[in-house]
Amino acid sequence: MQQAVGMYVEAPTPDEAARLINSGRKLGIVIAVGVCEVFYTGRAAASLGPTRRLVILKRDGTLLVHEAEKAQPKIWNPPGSSTAAYVEGGKLVVKSIRSRPFETVRVIFDKVDFIAAFDVGATELTLVGSERDVVGALVKNPSIIEEGLEVVGVEVPTDVGHLDILARDKNGRYVIIEVKRDLATHEAVFQLARYVELYRRKGYDVRGILVAGDITASAYDYLKRYGLNFVKINPRELMVLTNKNPLNAK
């Protein structure tokens, strides 16, 4: 069925679904619902068995695979990825490739229940409480992260980037803190691990803490492998605490 702002098909054939995905992404966004398996390969490997899922493809290359629970996708590829849909063995396949680092996501549909493409706009978001504001609030209130922390540096330059906060704990041990305002992914974990490894090579006794509004399941797994810690914050509450959010001013 054709509409002014897009198109949709219920129970499409694999060929119909592939055509709609490949042409529809130019409009802005494609959504597909169906029974599928998902396979991720890259820095690690992961797979999801067959069940009904929501798959979202965006014009900028973003791919999101959602299930019935939680806000974050189960598996995803970021903007800049290349996506194509095709039919293989009588099944619809959606393949997303990220070049750097090389990561692929393959979604294989056993059945497609619904697929739609819509003309969706893109705007700039004005944040109240940016990531820099969150860092500033944590610097003023380091006990939010951990009791006894003393901040010794902010935006500290290193050979692998600028670390957000450098602190010492109550035992005098250095603590490197990586801050993400919203959802932390494996990239944030890898960056924190690089900072910690750099300081350890220089002979420092150091540990790392990732502070964020939330963390993906895969990122949390990597965090534990590296022996790092996670502290969850609520950026909105943090801004209210430090009087940085004018929307909450009385």
Curated annotation (Swiss-Prot):
CDD domains noted in UniProt: NucS-like (cd22341)
Naturally occurring in which organism (per UniProt): Pyrobaculum aerophilum (strain ATCC 51768 / DSM 7523 / JCM 9630 / CIP 104966 / NBRC 100827 / IM2)
Keyword Hydrolase recorded: yes
GO cellular component, one term: cytoplasm
Pfam families: NucS_C, NucS_N
Protein name per UniProt: Endonuclease NucS
Disulfide bonds: none
The entry's keywords: Cytoplasm, DNA-binding, Endonuclease, Hydrolase, Nuclease
Coiled coil: none
